[in-house]
């Protein structure tokens, strides 16, 4: 069953975030993932959630998403994102058909 990594990002260092974005597509693909949402228009429907940017990645399964996030290859890239702004991230299982 597919799993999704959902990341809310508020960028404070555009140059560093641009560098981060150069490295992520290849790493995401290496772990079987793909971008489903990469920014774009948002509309708050409930609560006070007003994200400036949302990214959704799809992986073949929960374990693949964890392998990507916890991988030694991603660690230095993740550090770039964490220095380039504030973020929140979760992994969630998809719906079994």
At which residue positions do the language-model features occur?
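C-terminal structural segments of small proteins and small subunits
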Residues: 65-91
């Amino acid at each position: 069953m597919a799993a999704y990594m959902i990341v809310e990002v508020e960028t404070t260092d555009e140059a560093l975030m641009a560098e981060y974005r150069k490295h992520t597509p290849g790493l995401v693909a290496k772990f079987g993932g793909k971008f489903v949402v990469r920014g774009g228009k948002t509309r708050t429907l409930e609560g006070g959630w007003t994200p400036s940017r949302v990214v959704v990645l799809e992986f073949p399964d929960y374990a693949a998403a964890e392998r990507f996030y916890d991988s030694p290859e991603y660690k230095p890239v993740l550090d770039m994102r964490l220095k380039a702004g504030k973020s929140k991230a979760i992994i969630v299982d998809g719906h079994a058909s």
